[in-house]
Structures are given as C-alpha cells and as structure tokens.
Amino acid sequence: MSTQTKKVTRTIITSSSGGGGGGGGGRASYSSSGRFSGGGGRMRAGGVTSRRSVGSSYSAGGGGRVNAVMAAGVMASVGGPAGALQTLSDARMTRAHEKQELSHLNDRFASYIDKVRYLQERNSKLEAQIKIQESREAPNIKDLYEKELRDLRALVDELSNDKAQLEIERNNWQEQAEDYKMKWQDEAGLRSELEAEIERLKKELDAATMARLDLENKLSTAQEEIDFLKRVHDEEIRQLQDQLNESLTIVEVDSRAASTFAPGPDLTEALREIRTQYEELGRVNREDADVKYKQKFSELAHQRERDNEALMTARTEVTELRRNLNSLVAENEALKSKNHALEGSLAELEARMQLEIEEYQAAIRDLEQELETKTSEMAQQMQAYKMLMDTKMALDMEIAAYRKLLEGEEIRLFGESKEGVQQTSSSSSSSYQYSMKSGSGGGGGGSSSGKQQVTVSVSSGEEK
C-alpha cells in the first residue's frame, strides 16, 4: 500500500476593528494549499473579508520536493507520463477556475462582511447611545420633570392660597369701606339735619333779635313818651299853680277891696279851701300819673327782662348749636379725612393686589410655558428615542436579511464547491478554508468585534 498526498489550504483573515499606538491594526492573510490523498472529499464554507494575502505551501508525505511528489503521485494514479500530464493540466485548470471563483466569492463575501460589520458597528453605537441616553437622561428627566411639576404644583397651591388670603383681605377692606361709607352717609345726613336746624335757629335768632330791637325801640319810645308826659304833666301842674296863684291874688285883691267898701264873708278862708282842694287834686293827679308811669315802666321793665331772658336763651342756644356745629364739622372733617385715607389705602391695596396678581399670573404663565417647553422637549426626546428604536429594529432586520443572504451564499458556495470537487480526479483532494476575524494590532490595544469563518474542503484519496 502506498499513499501520496497533496494539500492546498486557503485562508482569508481580516480584521477591521482594532488599532493601537504601535502601528498595529487589522491583518489579512490568504493561504492556499492542495492535498491529494486516497479517500473521500468534503467541503466547509465560512466567512471571508475584504483584505487578503495569498500564500501557497505544498508538502509531501515524506518531506521531499513538491513537484517530485506530485509527479510521482500523478503517474502512479494514471499509469503513465501522458496520463499524468493530462491529469495535472486538468487539475491546474480546475484549481485556476476554483481560485478565480473563490476570489470572486471572496470579494463578494468581503463586501457583504464589510457592510455587515458597518451595520453591526452602527447598531452597537446606536445601542450604546440608547443605553447611555436611557441610563443618563430618562430617569433624570423623569425625576427633573416630576420635581419641577411638584414645585410648580406647590407654587400654584401657594399662589392660590395667597390669592384667597388677599381676596379675603380685600373683602374685609371692602366691608370696612362700606361700613365707613354708611357711617359717612349717616353723618352726612345728621349734618344736613343739623345744618337745617341751625338755619332754623338762625332764623329764630334773627326773629328774636328783631323782636328785641323792636322791644328796645318800643321801650325807648315809651320812655320818651313817659318823659314827654312827665314834662307835660309838670308843665300843666306849673300852669295850674300859676293860674291858681293868679286867681288867689285876684281874689285877695277883690276881697280886700270888698272888705274896704262893704263887710262880707271871709274870702281868705274860701281861697284857702280852694287852694287846698286844688292841691289835693294836683296831688291826686300826680299820684295817678306816678302810678300809671310806674305801672307802665314796670310793664316795660318786665317785658324788657323777658326779652333779655329770651335773648340770653337764644344766645345760649346759638352758642350751644355753634359748638355742636363746630364739633360736628370737626367730626365730619375727621371722618372725611379718615374716609379719604381709607379710600387711598383701599386703592393702594387694590393696586398692590392687582400688581401681585399680575405678577403671579405672569409667573404662572412663565411656568406653564416652561412646562410646555419641557413637555415638548420630553416629547422630542421620546420621538428621538422612538426613531432610534425604529432605526435599531430596521438595522436588526437588515442584519437578519444580510445574515440570510450570507447563509444562502454559504449554501450556494457549498453546492458549487461540491460540484467542482466532483469534477476533479478521485485521487486528488483539495481543502479550502476561509476565515474572517478581527483582532488587535501589534503595539496598540484593540477589541474583537466578531469572528466568521468559511471553510471549504474537498478530499479524494486512493490507497494501494
């Protein structure tokens, strides 16, 4: 029994991720070896990449030269030099065709793998961004918005309480203002009544003054009349006395003459009696005049005293009314000043309340606007997150589709390789291995993003 072996191995290794400071990076290698042995054939397909290097090695079972071993093996299998040359020519053509086909497949796989790696890297970056976004912003945004909402609700509650308190104070001030207004109206009505009473008393005072002046005039007139009557009475008495004296003188003369010429009654005695009668009559008249004068004077004096008393009473009432009027005027002025001050305080309070309400409303509007802005930003963040998730799902679906395409390419490659192997000589065996991996370069650190290997092996053997 004799065995001859020829082994061909092709390997493609590519790394697209990884780098370092020492000039490392990805590496790609492509090696090819052929193996001929007695036995069956097999093929295995894996992944390929874009960058490659090709190397070939041939080994014989005993470690001699490759060509001699190949020639000896071929000649032994075909039974002569001509058959061996034909077999070698067919094998070379088959290997060249396989090499060209595998190179084309390698390029196609490399493009697919590059796209898959790009999509995987992009998907990984998006997943990392999504995780970072979720871990960083989502809880913080939620807590931030919840805290802001709690603060805003607390502020709104506080503003509502302040507004209610201010409304209560405003209502109290309005009630006090209404009370003071009612009091002012009552005092104004009382003032009007007092002013009317004062006007009436002024009229009565004027009437009393006029009556007093009239009485004084009457008293003066009566006094003048009394004086005039007294003077007239005195003049009449004086005239009567003069007449009486003249009469007495004449009677005395006549009586003397008569006594001289003829004796008769005593005229002196008669004259004395007449004088006594006239004196008595004058006394009675004087007494009557004095009585009338005194009576009239007493009546006028009493009337004057009554008028003076009425005048004093009126003056006292006027003084009292003036004092009451001054007190009421002062109280009215005080109430007016107090009412004016209260109206000013009420207006100032209403203005301050209106200003505070406007400030609170502006703050509420700002907070609501900020809340709407934050809600809009949150909605935008959620929309962006949703778009990222949709992109991730689309990339996952695209990756799955490329994976299915790769699996289909593997199946197709496996079928084509199997058909190519069936066309080769039964004494030859070929093994092709494609591997794609990513790793770190020489000096720098790197990270491996994945490994995908396609191995195609075909073996056929013959033992003697």
Curated annotation (Swiss-Prot):
**Which residue ranges does the record annotate as region Tail?**
414-464
- Sequence segments annotated as region (Linker 1): 134-144
Superkingdom of origin organism: Eukaryota
- PROSITE patterns on file: IF_ROD_1, IF_ROD_2
Q: Where is this region: Linker 2?
A: 238-264
Q: Does the keyword Kinase apply?
A: no
Q: Where is this region: Disordered?
A: 1-59, 415-464
- Tell me the segments the record calls region Coil 1B: 145-237
Q: Where is this chain compositionally biased, Gly residues type?
A: 17-27, 439-448
Keyword annotations: Coiled coil, Cytoplasm, Intermediate filament
Q: Where is the composition biased (Polar residues)?
A: 1-14
Q: What is its main location?
A: cytoplasm
Q: Where is the composition biased (Low complexity)?
A: 45-59, 420-438, 449-464
**Pfam family, any one:** Filament
Q: Where is this region: Head?
A: 1-101
Q: Keyword Coiled coil, does the record have it?
A: yes
Q: Which residues form the IF rod domain?
A: 98-413
The record's Gene Ontology biological-process terms are: intermediate filament organization
The family line of this record is: Belongs to the intermediate filament family.
Subunit description:
Can form homopolymers.
Q: What is this protein called?
A: Non-neuronal cytoplasmic intermediate filament protein
- Source species of the chain: Branchiostoma lanceolatum
